[in-house]
Swiss-Prot record:
Full protein name: ATP synthase epsilon chain 2
UniProt cross-references to InterPro entries, sorted A to Z: ATP_synth_F1_dsu/esu, ATP_synth_F1_dsu/esu_N, ATPsynth_dsu/esu_N
One cellular-component annotation, GO: proton-transporting ATP synthase complex
Cited function: Produces ATP from ADP in the presence of a proton gradient across the membrane.
Membrane topology qualifier: Peripheral membrane protein
Keyword line: ATP synthesis, Cell inner membrane, Cell membrane, CF(1), Hydrogen ion transport, Ion transport, Membrane, Transport
Organism listed in the record: Nitrobacter hamburgensis (strain DSM 10229 / NCIMB 13809 / X14)
Tree of life domain: Bacteria
KW Transferase (keyword) present: no
Pfam family, one: ATP-synt_DE_N
Single GO MF annotation: ATP binding
Quaternary structure note: F-type ATPases have 2 components, CF(1) - the catalytic core - and CF(0) - the membrane proton channel. CF(1) has five subunits: alpha(3), beta(3), gamma(1), delta(1), epsilon(1). CF(0) has three main subunits: a, b and c.
Protein family per UniProt: Belongs to the ATPase epsilon chain family.
């Protein structure tokens, strides 16, 4: 499989730079897989998981929104905030979700509530994707 260059950058640091086979992105209009030879594209990103695949190696990163551009055989991901899944604080995320849930009950109907619900849903999806599976 042909590889391509990927850079994942946040305001804090360069989190990833390397040759990969595939990248899966959380686009605001749905998840998107990018392979070498993909048509040029610019995508707004929602909070979620970015997965890079190079052979048998998968790296996962949590992002809290951003922008991705694929052109001239390179993918650049500009994340609002990002961290490696390995270094992500799941307890802190759960606390943020609990705070969001409490504040949702106090908000009135309108655009602000719609944005808050969308953010809440994205954070819950991240938590679900990262939390260890539990038996019922």
């Amino acid at each position: 499989m042909t590889r391509f260059q990927v850079s994942l950058v946040s305001p804090e640091s360069l989190l990833f730079s390397g040759q990969v086979d595939q990248v899966d992105l959380p686009g605001i209009e749905g998840d998107l897989g990018v392979l070498a030879g993909h048509a040029p594209i610019v995508v707004m990103l929602r909070p979620g998981i970015v997965t890079t695949v190079a052979g048998d190696i998968r790296d996962r990163f949590v992002i809290l929104g951003g922008l991705a551009e694929f052109s001239q055989g390179e993918l650049t991901i500009l994340a609002d905030s990002a961290s490696s899944v390995d270094g992500f604080d799941l307890t802190r995320l759960k606390a943020q979700i609990d705070e969001m849930q409490e504040s949702l009950a106090k908000q009135s109907v309108g655009d602000e509530l719609d944005r808050a619900v969308a953010k809440f849903d994205h954070f819950k999806a991240i938590h679900t994707a990262l939390a260890p599976a539990t038996a019922f």
